[in-house]
């Protein structure tokens, strides 16, 4: 059987009723999206001759792996696709330049301490090298961005993030800060060197990667949000260019221009990295995306 089966009157009538298109109640946009989504799933079932057991196996996988959706989204490339799609829309609108955006990941925590420049991020003992990172935040014409707040977070040397550490050993907001920048747009911080991590062994993401013949590893990296009045909010991260997984990030977070190589000297490592923001055309562009994030009082 071919996918023309999905276009038969009986199936098309079913889709109309599923999406509520026969009713003038509800949200027309949601109806259209749901209809296309369900129809696409039907096409997949017919195209690949997916049987009943496989369908319910997929449902069980999603139910049991719901706690790892934040890892599955980047793992199957959807979070990176959103970045590429937004880049394409920017190009279509004539917007260009600025530090590349890349995936946020699932491990941001709201409410990190707000500190002044030259901040220490690490509260807990960690037997590893010290990272020093500094640079400038500028606008599209090279002007220093004033009143900016740089959010920064990363893992510890074991690859664990505070608030998500399965060992429970990290104090709240370890390796997490919001840094208020001065009028010169300069930032600086130091912390203990992060390490990369892998998805939880035996979890939904790990099982899917094994079925696909892929690994679930991320290189060592540091996450950033940057917000400032009059500029587009930036979500990005740097992957350490000398990490063996920098060119093969399971989450597809590696992007050209975001791969600095730390200058390692004894027990310290230094990264100089400048960020460039785009101007906002409206206040909505200054705001964060509306995804759910962990908030800690």
Language model feature labels by segment:
Residues 2-297:
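Beta-strand-dominated extracellular/periplasmic modules and repeats
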């Amino acid at each position: 059987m071919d996918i023309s089966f999905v276009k038969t009157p009986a199936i098309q009538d079913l889709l109309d009723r599923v999406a509520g298109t026969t009713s003038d109640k509800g949200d027309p946009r949601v109806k259209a999206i749901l209809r296309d989504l369900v129809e696409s799933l039907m096409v997949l079932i017919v195209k690949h001759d997916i049987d009943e057991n496989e369908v319910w196996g997929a449902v069980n996988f999603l139910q049991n792996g719901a706690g790892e959706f934040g890892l599955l989204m980047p793992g199957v490339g959807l979070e990176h696709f959103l970045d590429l799609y937004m880049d394409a829309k920017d190009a279509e609108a004539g917007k260009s330049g600025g530090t590349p955006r890349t995936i946020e990941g699932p491990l941001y925590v709201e409410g990190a301490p707000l500190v002044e420049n030259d901040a220490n991020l690490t509260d807990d003992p960690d037997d590893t090298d010290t990272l020093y990172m500094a640079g400038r935040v500028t606008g599209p014409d090279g002007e220093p961005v004033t009143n900016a707040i740089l959010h920064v977070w990363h893992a510890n040397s074991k690859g664990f993030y505070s608030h998500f550490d399965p060992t429970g050993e990290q104090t709240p907001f370890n390796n997490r800060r919001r840094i208020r920048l001065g009028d010169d747009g300069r930032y600086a911080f130091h912390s203990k060197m992060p390490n990369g991590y892998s998805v939880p062994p035996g979890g939904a993401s790990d099982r899917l990667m094994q079925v696909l013949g892929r690994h679930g590893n991320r290189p060592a990296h540091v996450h950033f949000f940057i917000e400032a009045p009059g500029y587009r909010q930036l979500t990005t991260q740097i992957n350490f260019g000398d990490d063996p997984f920098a060119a093969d990030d399971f989450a597809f977070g590696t992007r050209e221009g975001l791969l600095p190589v730390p200058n390692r000297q004894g027990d310290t490592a230094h990264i100089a990295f400048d960020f460039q923001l785009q101007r906002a055309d409206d206040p909505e562009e200054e705001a964060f995306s509306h995804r759910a994030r962990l908030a800690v009082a």
